[in-house]
């Protein structure tokens, strides 16, 4: 039995979708940034069979469900010309690679426990020439500032890592003073919020509108007392 091939899609079609999507999000990208994002989609599709990065194989759906979904959080994270960002459970590099492309002033670190996914992330750093991107393999709860990572982070993000309460428990020791944990979720996770550990609380809840995606999406900013 042969693997099902992804449908071929003209790059111009994807570029037009990206232009329309970023306009809907009120984001302005340079030509170079658009090309990097389109190259990333192509590379994600090319290496997906080897690294098992995503169940989505249609390039159009990759653009919508991965790129535009990741871009939808950018307006809410902006406000810093420089920031240290950790993407936990990054997998194929989402949202971290997208953040590194559109915010070159940020230092973005991708984290995953699976070595082959870290290998793909490292390859993307080289192919997309992302000098502001780094990769660290290992369990987030085992990462120590000054050892596995240089220092604590202003923003710790996750797109599909874990239950919100578990995410906070595992990553809170890496939040810099004044920093926050940012979790991307689908439907509003009332039960997960109710189980947030002591010394943490939801600072803001944002209903995301992802262009061309008819699905409920939320972004949660969680503050932790440890970071004060």
UniProtKB/Swiss-Prot annotation:
Its main location: cytoplasm. GO terms for molecular function: rRNA (guanine-N7-)-methyltransferase activity. S-adenosyl-L-methionine binds at residues 89, 94, 140-141, 159. It is found in: Cytoplasm. It is an enzyme of class 2 (transferase). Belongs to the methyltransferase superfamily. RNA methyltransferase RsmG family. Specifically methylates the N7 position of guanine in position 527 of 16S rRNA. This is Ribosomal RNA small subunit methyltransferase G. It comes from Burkholderia cenocepacia (strain ATCC BAA-245 / DSM 16553 / LMG 16656 / NCTC 13227 / J2315 / CF5610) (Burkholderia cepacia (strain J2315)). The lineage of its organism: Bacteria, Pseudomonadati, Pseudomonadota, Betaproteobacteria, Burkholderiales. The gene is rsmG.
């Amino acid at each position: 039995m042969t693997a099902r091939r992804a449908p071929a899609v003209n790059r111009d079609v994807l570029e037009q979708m990206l232009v329309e999507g970023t306009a809907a999000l009120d984001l302005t990208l340079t030509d170079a940034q658009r090309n990097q994002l389109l190259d990333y989609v192509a590379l994600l599709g090319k290496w997906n069979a080897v690294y098992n990065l995503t169940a989505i194989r249609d390039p159009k759906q990759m653009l919508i469900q991965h790129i535009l979904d990741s871009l939808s959080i950018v307006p809410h994270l902006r406000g810093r010309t420089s920031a240290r960002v950790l993407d936990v459970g990054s997998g194929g590099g989402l949202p971290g690679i997208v953040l590194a492309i559109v915010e070159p002033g940020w230092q973005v670190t991708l984290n995953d426990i699976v070595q082959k996914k870290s290998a793909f992330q490292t390859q993307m750093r080289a192919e997309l020439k992302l000098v502001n991107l780094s990769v660290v393999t290992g369990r987030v709860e085992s990462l120590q500032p000054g050892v596995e990572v240089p220092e604590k982070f202003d923003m710790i993000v996750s797109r599909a890592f874990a239950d919100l309460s578990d995410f906070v428990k595992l990553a809170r020791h890496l939040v810099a003073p004044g920093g926050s944990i940012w979790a991307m979720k689908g439907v509003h996770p009332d039960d997960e919020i109710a189980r947030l550990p002591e010394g943490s609380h939801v600072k803001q809840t944002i209903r995301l509108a992802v262009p061309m995606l008819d699905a409920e999406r939320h972004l949660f900013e969680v503050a932790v007392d440890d970071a004060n």
